């Protein structure tokens, strides 16, 4: 029978039937007749829907394949064949949009013309017997029932057959053909006799019959029947049992399960030491942009052309000087590097035709800044394995750093709105199915909340910089290429805008492995005076390079313009992930969706619209020393996005470890809040695992401080 089914039915139908049987824990190798019945039922549902459309006038029409008008609305929504969650989502959506009564059981189809759900039946017995069984099970006047048999008979509610005669004849012919094919292989009799009646779930949920036998058979050793096992589980006290099991395992294991009470957890110990410093690959809140609106210059879109055009918008350049030296670096080299960039940009402008890319002269200052010839020479292992004192470099333990307020300010700034639009709404065609309509509605609401967000600017900036750097690393491996740091956006009025943040000069980049490092020097414009928070800028040499006139309430004011210069490095794998920072949008959208789903399941209807449009409602955003912070749904969207973006910008082994280990502690605390009486052993070991990740990373230290606020408020 299984071979016959695979030959006789479309592979897609066979695959759906396999999934359905798997979902209900049935073996298609054993239940071959059931397999054939499911395939037959699926095919009838699909044939019922095929070629039936609704035109612009709302009339039902039949369109055969190959007709150019086939983009009309389908008359029937197919519910059968989808997984249960998706099927119920579609049913709920249809009920919300059409006002139809929600059925108790999943129907097979929805008819948009007659506005009713349809239950399709295919029987090997008398149609009227099967019809009565279906009606008795559904107990709903609203769901339309249509039964077909393998003998060409049919029966439908109130003799209303929904489809035209030709469409129904096509279904009956197909069923007759299946019967003939089965009979010719000697499979029909077994198939006909295997049909059971519709089974309804009793109101009192008692396990009887086959299920009861299976329950009695599927018990752990030492239990005679299901009732004994159920009684044992109901009275089970886990803590003492686990202790006993552990003591049997080994003489060394001596774990006592300690109850986890409100007084048990202590705050995480944050490290002492000098304040932590900025370690992102580009400036965040301190960045300054030189911008052009409605760019239409020759070569628009070519980064070097755009950069030169942006540089021309500023007239306040002055002789640069170091205002905050880098403690360990040769600061005159950073100064000379900036002067070299200005000089070489001037050279380009003097040329008749501006080149598309610019490779910098390999001066001594750039060689120093890019670590040229600084790497120790690699020697083949065979040539030195006889060296007696061969050993790995002694590496210093990382210096402990304390949390500094600047990282919280950075995060707050990332959640704020800017006056530009950083992402466009997707240009997506008309939605066909209700589920697509819900998805695109959620996406549009979410995009509207985050398109102006500074975190979204960081995404687009990160994508651009990483893409440009990876391209240059592959295309110009030996060159010190000058790479402008550019982003594009739209103003509130919808005008296009190109922004220049500064420049990167990349070093030699023969990147064979994913983790091979390419060095680069970044030079970024800013109005932030580094002397206000010198600890934040430990890794930078900061120059004063000009004066910028800014409009303010009292008229124009002049502010010094700074250039933040540092040597940095990245790898192929880091650039690859940097190029995919748009995933942060998807991650935070999914988090918002799960909030909407939770709300929708309580209200039993899709709550997307209410969720985003009820401006008076506030939602929890996070913990602070003051307590639980709340805000609008837009603020929640932007905060979740900023967290995701910072996880990408500040990705590190410390963050990986902290996230994984602190999650365990979080789950225990959550269990306590839910009155689940959690027990723990070696809680000290868990704290150790969390705290060994608290070294010097600003984002990890901030998360640890948030975690402590959460502990304080969660356990009040």
Swiss-Prot record:
Free-text cofactor note: Binds 2 manganese ions per subunit.
A Pfam entry, by short name: Flu_PA
EC class of the enzyme, as a word: hydrolase
Classification via InterPro entries: INFV_PA, PA/PA-X, PA/PA-X_sf
UniProt record similarity statement: Belongs to the influenza viruses PA family.
Source organism of the structure: Influenza A virus (strain A/USA:Huston/AA/1945 H1N1)
Name of the encoding gene: PA
Protein name per the record: Polymerase acidic protein
Quaternary assembly: Influenza RNA polymerase is composed of three subunits: PB1, PB2 and PA. Interacts (via C-terminus) with PB1 (via N-terminus).
One GO CC annotation: host cell cytoplasm
GO BP, one annotated term: DNA-templated transcription
Role: Plays an essential role in viral RNA transcription and replication by forming the heterotrimeric polymerase complex together with PB1 and PB2 subunits. The complex transcribes viral mRNAs by using a unique mechanism called cap-snatching. It consists in the hijacking and cleavage of host capped pre-mRNAs. These short capped RNAs are then used as primers for viral mRNAs. The PB2 subunit is responsible for the binding of the 5' cap of cellular pre-mRNAs which are subsequently cleaved after 10-13 nucleotides by the PA subunit that carries the endonuclease activity.
Organism superkingdom: Viruses
EC number assigned by the record: 3.1.-.-
